[in-house]
């Protein structure tokens, strides 16, 4: 334990000791080893972070949009220069393969920051004439202090998705990463400070969501909460935010997304998409297409194509560059996923491949679960209805496309959906009927900075990324001007 680094909170541009006296450990899920000990924030520390953010936000908002953009662009450059260093830390903390974190997590996070750095100068109001002697104009003003609460599956990417539009609009952010993957948020805070962000504009507090999250959502000074996580927790955050000071919220929550493969689909392409939609990042992606609908007559050929591809997955040490499938994020999460797999077996689904914990050699030390494909699934099965957040695909057959659409929509979730077909007209007709916020045709999973991300139904409120997100980090002030005489009715 003497070699394990102790991490403090990051408040007002520097590391500072928490006052709670409590700590928690970050565990490498590939080995079970403790890699860091993190101090947990107290309510006193949250107050200090809010006070710091309020002070820093005034300095930040007073800068011109060009100045803010310049500082954020510097941060982008530093992120890209340190891509591999950050990716190695992310892999250590999350268990995700370095081949993934080095090409996706930091890269796409930096892309979003660069996108909003460019949009910082485009935040503007409008002027509208009312009559010859009067007009009104609007100002887009920052909210002030906002809070971001991150999830454990894309720690630094989520921190950037939340902080980039907030900072571009002139706000300060207090960010709480998941206690399961707490480390790269510290590095992002350091990078922001190095780039020239004023002290307090990006603070990092650590600890359990049920405590820290509640203090943030109920704080009177905090004007907005952006949360990524599970549906039930999201409902509590939203209720708390509404019950305190009626804060604005953005919620990116869970999913159980359908992937519909049409009669005319190229099965090789369909199998490629289905495997990527289920096993990328070891299946720990909110938008995963875990309900795969296939026409009955194509079932056997599709299953064979999927199994062939799953056999090519390279599970192993996530730090090795040839590994493309690492452990799950934690041992408790592994047990949860294994319990879902057991449920699938008990309810009569057939395991085509996988279905167990991976225990060969050094894999036994980590939270590894075999990529698992179930077939002969039914809509009422637990593995089909509930979000597993692991490497578990469920194959379901259908007779008509109308049936597939109806069943695809028969869920409380509505995060993502996809269609594979060679008939582009049919693709659009199907997509327009699917109740989901993020949809893909003949592909899966890409989320460019320009594309809004968010769900329907219980999968979320509001959007992240895209131009419109900036509107939710500002508020509009309307000002009428009268140039002529003023006539009172009294």
Curated annotation (Swiss-Prot):
Keywords: Metal-binding, NAD, NADP, Oxidation, Oxidoreductase, Potassium. NAD(+) binds at residues 150-152, 176-179, 230-233, 254, 286, 387. The active site is at 162 (charge relay system), 252 (proton acceptor), 286 (nucleophile), 464 (charge relay system). One of its GO terms (molecular function) is betaine-aldehyde dehydrogenase (NAD+) activity. It catalyses: betaine aldehyde + NAD(+) + H2O = glycine betaine + NADH + 2 H(+). Pfam families: Aldedh (PF00171). K(+) 2 binds at residues 246, 457, 460. The record marks 248 as: Seems to be a necessary countercharge to the potassium cations. One of its GO terms (biological process) is glycine betaine biosynthetic process from choline. Binds 2 potassium ions per subunit. Its cofactor is K(+). K(+) 1 binds at residues 26-27, 93, 180. Pathway: Amine and polyamine biosynthesis; betaine biosynthesis via choline pathway; betaine from betaine aldehyde: step 1/1. InterPro entries: Ald_DH/histidinol_DH (IPR016161), Ald_DH_C (IPR016163), Ald_DH_CS_CYS (IPR016160), Ald_DH_CS_GLU (IPR029510), Ald_DH_N (IPR016162), Aldehyde_DH_dom (IPR015590), BADH (IPR011264). It is an enzyme of class 1 (oxidoreductase). NCBIfam families: BADH, PRK13252.1. Dimer of dimers. This is Betaine aldehyde dehydrogenase. It comes from Acinetobacter baylyi (strain ATCC 33305 / BD413 / ADP1).
């Amino acid at each position: 334990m003497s070699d394990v680094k102790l991490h403090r909170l990051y408040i007002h541009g520097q590391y500072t000791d928490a006052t709670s006296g409590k700590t928690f450990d970050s565990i490498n899920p590939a080995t079970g080893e403790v890699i860091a000990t993190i101090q947990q924030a107290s309510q006193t520390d949250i107050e200090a972070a809010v006070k710091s953010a309020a002070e820093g936000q005034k300095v930040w908002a007073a800068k011109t949009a060009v100045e803010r953009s310049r500082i954020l662009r510097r941060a982008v450059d530093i992120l890209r220069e340190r891509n591999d260093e950050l990716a190695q830390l992310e892999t250590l903390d999350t268990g995700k393969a370095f081949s993934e974190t080095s090409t996706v997590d930091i890269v796409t996070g930096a892309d979003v920051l660069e996108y909003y750095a460019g949009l910082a100068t485009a935040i503007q109001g409008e002027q509208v004439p009312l009559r010859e002697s009067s007009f009104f104009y609007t100002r887009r003003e920052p909210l002030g202090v906002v809070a971001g609460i991150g999830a454990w599956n894309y720690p630094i990417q989520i921190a950037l998705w939340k902080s980039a539009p907030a900072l571009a609009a002139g706000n300060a952010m207090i960010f709480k990463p998941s206690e399961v993957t707490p480390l790269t948020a510290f590095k992002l805070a350091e990078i922001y400070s190095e780039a020239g962000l004023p002290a307090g504009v990006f603070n990092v507090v650590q600890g359990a969501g049920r405590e820290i999250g509640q203090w943030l959502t109920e704080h009177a000074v905090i004007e907005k909460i952006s949360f990524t996580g599970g549906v039930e927790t999201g409902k509590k955050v939203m209720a708390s935010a509404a019950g305190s000071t009626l804060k604005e919220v953005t919620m990116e929550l869970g999913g159980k997304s359908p992937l519909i493969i049409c009669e005319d689909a190229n099965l090789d392409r369909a199998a490629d998409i289905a495997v990527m939609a289920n096993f990328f990042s070891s299946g720990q992606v909110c938008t995963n297409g875990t309900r795969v609908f296939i026409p009955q007559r194509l079932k056997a050929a599709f299953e064979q194509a999927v199994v062939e591809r799953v056999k090519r997955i390279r599970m192993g040490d996530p730090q090795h560059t040839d590994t493309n499938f690492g452990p799950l994020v934690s041992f408790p999460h592994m047990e949860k996923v294994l319990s879902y797999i057991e449920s699938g077996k008990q309810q009569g689904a057939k395991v085509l491949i996988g279905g167990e914990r991976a225990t060969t050699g050094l894999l036994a030390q980590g939270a590894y679960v075999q990529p698992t494909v179930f077939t002969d699934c039914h809509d009422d099965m637990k593995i089909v209805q509930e979000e597993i957040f692991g490497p578990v695909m469920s194959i379901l057959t259908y007779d008509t496309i109308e049936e597939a659409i109806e069943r695809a929509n028969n869920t409380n979730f509505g995060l993502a959906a996809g269609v594979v077909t060679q008939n582009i007209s049919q693709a659009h007709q199907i997509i327009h009927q699917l109740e989901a916020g993020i949809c893909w045709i003949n592909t899966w999973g890409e989320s460019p900075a320009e594309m809004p991300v968010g769900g329907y139904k219980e999968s979320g409120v509001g959007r992240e990324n895209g131009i419109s997100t900036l509107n939710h980090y500002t508020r509009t002030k309307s000002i009428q001007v009268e140039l002529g005489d003023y006539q009172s009715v009294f």
